[in-house]
Curated annotation (Swiss-Prot):
Keywords: Cell membrane, Membrane, Transmembrane, Transmembrane helix. It is found in: Cell membrane. It comes from the Bacteria. GO terms for cellular component: plasma membrane. Its main location: membrane. InterPro entries: DUF1232. It holds the Pfam family DUF1232. This is Uncharacterized membrane protein YkvA.
Length: 106
């Protein structure tokens, strides 16, 4: 049941990302994703869970890969699946990313 709820929340998050007012926040989340991966790789932030790192890596790979569920060349529709994946990943790891952001501010 938790997975189904997470998928539904991810899809809702994906729709929210597509709204113009939420794009800035989405870009901030993506930036945080990359910063967390970089800090973990450099050994600066060793508290990351392996699950979180794998999910972040999978999300980034999915977004940059040319093969998608909905191809990116279809204007207007091509980024819906990318947004849904970002929304799903964010739903699954937002607690740890919040902890990471607090750690960065220290």
């Amino acid at each position: 049941m938790k997975k189904k709820k997470a998928i539904m929340l991810g899809a809702a998050g994906g729709k929210a990302i597509l709204k113009r007012k939420n794009r800035k926040k989405c870009i901030q989340h993506i930036t945080t994703f990359f910063q967390m991966l970089r800090d973990w790789r450099n050994g600066d932030y060793p508290r990351s869970q392996v699950k979180t790192l794998l999910l972040l890596t999978a999300a980034i790979l999915y977004i940059v890969m040319p093969l998608d569920i909905i191809p990116d060349v279809i204007l207007g529709l091509g980024f819906i699946d990318d947004a849904a994946v970002l929304g799903l990943i964010w739903t699954l790891i937002k607690k740890e990313l919040s902890q990471y952001e607090k750690w960065r501010l220290q």
